[in-house]
Each structure stands twice: as structure tokens, then as C-alpha cells.
Amino acid sequence: MNINKPLEILGHVSWLWASSPLHRNWPVSLFAINVLPAIQANQYVLLTRDDYPVAYCSWANLSLENEIKYLNDVTSLVAEDWTSGDRKWFIDWIAPFGDNGALYKYMRKKFPDELFRAIRVDPKTHVGKVSEFHGGKIDKQLANKIFKQYHHELITEVKRKSDFNFSLTG
């Protein structure tokens, strides 16, 4: 293994974070929480053009328990949480140079039969909402059925927790 490869990846991702209006003012501690586990678990995509990074995406495969933990506090995941289950969550999606469409197409092709969710934050209100994404080959009706099952499992489990702070209403 080339020892410089992880450092090179970190450099590329840090460049993208610094170039992203959403990410550039986030603390370094969030970079460590969001990026290092993704690289360690090989749960990321880094798109380059002419050897320059243009887009980055990372995801965690969470258990239901860790999904609830993440929704309650997006800074709560530790390295082992990233590979704790089969419930896929996009953690970072960064395309500051107009390559969002290319990253979207790449991810749909890379994960043709997979489902993902993400917390998307409105940059003006700083309010987050859960969004759903699916691969390019999965049937939309099947995807919706599975997402509904995920929501049912999530809501059922959240109702059992007295310390959950995430709002279940829009």
C-alpha cells in the first residue's frame, strides 16, 4: 500500500471542503469526524478532472441504533459506526465546481440497486431534512416501499427513546 495515498486523498478532500461554501467554515473537528472514517472504511468517492479534485461523496452503513444516534446528533458517529449496518447514509456530498450532476450519475451507476438517505441542510435557514436517493436500476415503487419500511422502523424505535431531540414533523 502506498503510504501517501490516504494523505493524498485527505489533501484532495480538504481542498474540496475549503472550496465549498457550506463546508469551508466548519471546524476541523467535523472534518476528522466526517472524513477520516470514510477513508478508513473505503466508503467514499473522489472524482477528479485533470488530476484535480472536483467532487467528493462519503457514506456510512449504519445500524438502526446508529442511524438514530446520527439523526439525534450528526457529530456523534465514531469509526466503528460507519460499518455497523446496512442502512446507507450520505455523510458528505461536495461538488463546489459545478460537478454535482457528474457525482449524482456516478453514484447511481456505482450503486445501481442501493438506497441512500441524507440530511440536507438549507443554507439560509440551517434547517435539515432527510432526503432519499436510489440507484439507477432499482424499481421506484420498490425503493419507495423499502424507504417506508425504514421510516416505520425508525419512528417505532424513536418513540421508545426518551432522549431523542430530532423533530418527526415537517
From Swiss-Prot:
Changing residue 70 to G: Strongly decreased acyltransferase activity. Changing residue 96 to A: Strongly decreased acyltransferase activity. Keywords: Acyltransferase, Cytolysis, Cytoplasm, Heme, Hemolysis, Iron, Metal-binding, Plasmid, Transferase, Virulence. Its EC number is 2.3.1.-. GO terms for biological process: killing of cells of another organism; toxin metabolic process. Proteolytically cleaved by the protease systems ClpAP, ClpXP and FtsH, leading to its degradation. GO terms for cellular component: cytoplasm. It catalyses: tetradecanoyl-[ACP] + L-lysyl-[protein] = N(6)-tetradecanoyl-L-lysyl-[protein] + holo-[ACP] + H(+). The acyltransferase activity is inhibited by heme. Changing residue 76 to A: Slightly decreased acyltransferase activity. Its main location: cytoplasm. One of its GO terms (molecular function) is metal ion binding. Belongs to the RTX toxin acyltransferase family. Protein-lysine myristoyltransferase that catalyzes myristoylation of the protoxin (HlyA) at two internal lysine residues, thereby converting it to the active toxin. Monomer. This is Protein-lysine myristoyltransferase HlyC. It comes from Escherichia coli.
